[in-house]
Amino acid sequence: MISLRTHAARSLLALGALAAATSAAAQSGAPDRAVVGIAAVYTPGYQGGDDYRLMPFPVIDVTYGRFFASGREGVGYTVLDGSAVKVSAGATFVPGYRRRDAPVGVGRLDGGAGLRVAADMRLGEVLVSMSATKVVSGDVDGALVDASLAYPVRLSERLSLMPSVSATWADSQYNRAYFGISAAQSAASKLPVYRPGGGVKDVSMSLSANYRLNDKVSLGATASLSRLTGDARKSPIVVEATQPSAVLSVAYRF
């Protein structure tokens, strides 16, 4: 099973937010939508790694009433859908990493399901998003809090851009599962034992573009740069603290 890396997930989130904003502006009054497509994702094998992968990933964004399902937000229900504030709750996938991507001896970290609560607010032209995720299955553990600021700009009837900045806080359980080195892993990998604490684990910036070929088909692109911070950056598994990622996509709206 292909797991979406944290960097690529963030890039798809930004790209999806821009596409949704563009679609809403172009087709107001039609809240239900079904968008499918394919994306080419360039991403590190894991946060902090120095090997990169180019892989395909499906684009899915379905909304029916207050229910939604998408590759960027998971599946869930919109509890509050106001003109300036939207609050939702649901479940999403929290990625781990493959054995072949991690340093020798560290082993595989299976991703799992997470329960997610999110709030999106519009402050003038600025989009503010916050979410909290509690991991409930898999080898990954703990909780994550994400916050982002974005500024969508419509350059023409077809072309929109959106720069954004974001940060992720992780508790000690998550950081120990993802970035920690246990005694057994230390013996197998020759890396030192490491028990990180919680804190802001990364900050990122991205630029997304969406181009509507027509009312049904759109092209998307996102380039992102993320930097690990705090105890996550000090982990023995971190080779590159600053990592790029990119997504190119084509999507069809039914």
UniProtKB/Swiss-Prot annotation:
GO CC, alphabetical: cell outer membrane
Pfam families, per the entry: MipA
Keyword Signal: yes
Main location: membrane
SUPFAM superfamilies: Porins
Annotated signal peptide: 1-26
Domain of life: Bacteria
Keywords: Cell outer membrane, Membrane, Signal
Transmembrane segments: none
Membrane topology designation: Peripheral membrane protein
Protein location: Cell outer membrane
Similarity-based family: Belongs to the MipA/OmpV family.
PANTHER family on file: MLTA-INTERACTING PROTEIN-RELATED
Protein name from the UniProt record: Putative outer membrane protein CC_0351
Native organism: Caulobacter vibrioides (strain ATCC 19089 / CIP 103742 / CB 15)
